[in-house]
Amino acid sequence: MAVVRLHLTLIEMAGGRKELTIDAQQPVLLTTLLAQLGVPEEEVGIIVRNRKRDEIDCMIQDEDVVELFPILSGG
């Protein structure tokens, strides 16, 4: 099983889900998962997979832990 954790505004976009556990015995594209959750790709700013930065087109595999953060802005 893989764990996907959403942060800040991404939680609301995903219907209030903060953490998901998915069966990833077959690798799944992060973009596919985001589409299923209703989270637009362009809203995801930082992706951390297994404690390392990753890209939006990464493959989620069994035992992965993925943290998703929205685009942050400020001044």
Question: Where are the regions a protein language model picked out?
Answer:
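Ubiquitin-like/PB1-type beta-grasp interaction modules and other compact soluble beta-rich domains
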Residues: 1-74
